[in-house]
Amino acid sequence: MSEVEYNQENTHYAEVDNFDRDAMSQTRARSRSPVAGGAPSSDRRDRDRTDRTDRTDRSDRPRSFNDRAIASQHAATQASRKSQKNCRVYVGNLSYGVKWNTLKDFMREAVDVLLGDTRDGSITRARNASAARWLNESRRQCGWIADGKVLRFCPGWVTGGILQHLNHVRVAIQHSTRFPSFHRQPSIVYTAGHVVFSEVLTLPNGSSKGCGIVEYSTPEEAQKAIREMTNKQLEGRQVFVREDREDEVRYGTSPGGPPRGGGRGGLGGSSGRGSFGPPVRGGFYGGPPPPPYGGFGGGAPTQLFIGNLPFDVSWQDLKDLFRSAGNITRADINMGHDGRSKGSGIVAYADSNDASNAIAMYHGYEFRGRMLEVRLDKFASAPPMDPYGRAGYGPPPRGGRGGFGGAYGGRGGYGGRGGYGSGYGDPYGGGYSHEAYGGAYGGGYGGGYGDRHGAAGGYSTRASGPTSARAPAPPAAPSQQIFVKNLPWSTSNEDLVELFQTTGKVDEAEIVIGGGRSKGCGVVQFATVEDAETAIAKFNNYVYGGRPLDIEFNRRWTKFGTGGGSVNGGNDGNAPMVEVSAQDDEDGDAPVPMQG
């Protein structure tokens, strides 16, 4: 067996863009690949050990969280200076656990080893020297042979044969301990291209927006990514890819600052001060107590809260640990504003039986020296329901408007009219505002947005007592404006523009403001009615920031510049605005929104 000789004269090394995040991260602790110093070599025996001196000393690498953040921001700044709009693509509908490196690997979708037809004497290519050394070592152990020739791997670009005219190729290879001789030309799979930078967009509190930006080395590669990567699965979600429509790049950390939101309301009581009183005053006795494992949307619960986790546990570790209990659809680690773990996480199963098994198996389980707390997640996002569906802990009988299920009477509390009580639309409860009066989407969480005879989101009215249910309002006439409800409290005007410009041209977008804080809803105006219809069809019930959005055409035309239509912000043409005075706020009679 003759070994393929490496012809240095016929070798052309691939250019590495100097603002590729992979190249710039060599001085960061995240990097794992050594820097190749001198002439490339495919064998450890031929490697000059003096090349190690060119590497950055490990002691000089940033180790603290702040140092790594500064290094990451510096890399983003350098990439922004050389970024080209026609090379960038926007990737939407990402899972909230996707990080920039996962996104980059997905959009690149190429393995480190690129194999060509060796019958004409061409040499296979590895992405870097480290991969080449590993492959050559594996080749010696496994005896990778093709047509009587021993495969030899080298870094850089090799001319000759089928590899001469391709930039990024890969071959589907069966996993085996020994490759048989090739009797036919290997099948070549083209990838989208070379990714030079990727970033997942985040909210001010550090959580993912579910979208990101990826930049390729050439416009042709970006267009190829749009054609080939759209509707592909990434961590259980079909992503969509389009060109980036922003003239200015958005690389770098999102602007910080505390998320907007109000204080916590009480646990019931007729004046919202919190009470465990009789049914007429709300509180926990406003309705029947919640069952031990009550769910949302009337279905069995599937999402678990995992507490007392070690702070170094990643979402991959969490998913691997709980995988034995059943099919996991999502696993997340709760992160603080500083990017560090809070020591807790969320695991969602596809089946409620699997969730019950996980509680039985892992509650009290010792993991890395800690006893885990495993229970049902009480704050799991509820799926959209029909206008009269019960989505709380149980049916809402007539009782306190606070508490876990009252219909009317008290104020505030953990639900009642909206929240954990009547769910998404009981006639006597809250929900999506199909009731006579009361704060929609949760009395306990400060009302939410848009009630019938109450404040247009955020506050509940003082009236209490039985009343007849109003019929659901007819759908609004199509227009260029849409009304978006159940937004995260930290959502800004710019976030609205970024979210909805994926479906069409956005002329204006504003968050509804009341009392100096967000009401959890907003108005978006498109250039055409068709764009507005597309946005409703695409983003209604879309989970954004952990909340399912409720979108419809705006019933009353909003003039922008007044806090997102604070005068016209009510989403029902028959709902008058109810102003909450400062005195009411001081007395505690008017519950204020709480950050969800």
Swiss-Prot record:
GO-annotated molecular function: mRNA binding; RNA binding
Annotated localization: Nucleus
Ranges of compositional bias, category Basic and acidic residues: 12-23, 42-66
BP terms from Gene Ontology: nuclear mRNA surveillance; poly(A)+ mRNA export from nucleus
Main location, first listed in the record: nucleus
Pfam family, one: RRM_1
Residue ranges of every copy of the RRM domain listed in the record: 182-246, 302-379, 480-556
Disordered: annotated span: 1-83, 244-279, 458-478, 563-596
Biased composition (Polar residues): 1-11
Keyword terms, alphabetized: Nucleus, Repeat, RNA-binding
Record field: compositional bias (Gly residues): 259-275, 563-572
Induction behaviour: Increased in the filamentous form induced by acid pH. Increased during thermal and cold stress.
Gene Ontology CC annotations of this record: cytoplasm; nucleus; ribonucleoprotein complex
InterPro entries found in the cross-reference section: Nucleotide-bd_a/b_plait_sf, RBD_domain_sf, RRM_dom, RRT5_SRSF_SR
Consequences of knocking out this gene: Cells appear vacuolated with a cell separation defect. Leads to abnormal mating. Cells accumulate melanin and hydrogen peroxide, leading to activation of oxidative stress responses. Sensitive to hydrogen peroxide and boron. Decreases cell population growth. Decreases virulence in Z.mays.
Function noted in UniProt: Binds to intron-containing transcripts and is involved in quality control for the export of spliced mRNAs from the nucleus. Binds to pre-mRNAs until splicing is completed or until faulty mRNAs are degraded.
Protein name per UniProt: Serine/arginine (SR)-type shuttling mRNA binding protein
Organism (species): Mycosarcoma maydis (Corn smut fungus)
Protein encoded by which gene: RRM75
